[in-house]
Amino acid sequence: MKKKPIQKQRSRRRLPPIKSGEKIDYKNLDLLRRFLSEQGKILSKRVNRLTSKQQRTMTIAIKRARILALIPFLNNEN
């Protein structure tokens, strides 16, 4: 009996979530919304594919934007 050859899975290189020119800032609402769930929760570092430093900066920026009422704390639109 012949064995089937093992196929290698090609790993697609994913693009970084934040482009080199983008700055994480509480005023950049389009960028902040990409890292929030539909319910308004901050997504984890593993899901976002951010570095630890970027995740900390993103969390602080989202919290500042929430306090200034630029983005809602919860998104309960049903």
From Swiss-Prot:
Disulfide bonding pattern of the chain: none
Name of this chain's protein: Small ribosomal subunit protein bS18c
Keywords (A to Z) from UniProt: Chloroplast, Plastid, Ribonucleoprotein, Ribosomal protein, RNA-binding, rRNA-binding
Region Disordered: start-end pairs: 1-20
Domain of life per record: Eukaryota
GO terms for biological process, alphabetical: translation
Protein family per UniProt: Belongs to the bacterial ribosomal protein bS18 family.
Known partners and oligomeric status: Part of the 30S ribosomal subunit.
PROSITE patterns named among the record's database cross-references: RIBOSOMAL_S18
Biased composition (Basic residues): 1-16
Pfam family, one: Ribosomal_S18
GO annotation, cellular component aspect: chloroplast; mitochondrial small ribosomal subunit
Stored SUPFAM superfamilies: Ribosomal protein S18
Keyword Nucleotide-binding assigned: no
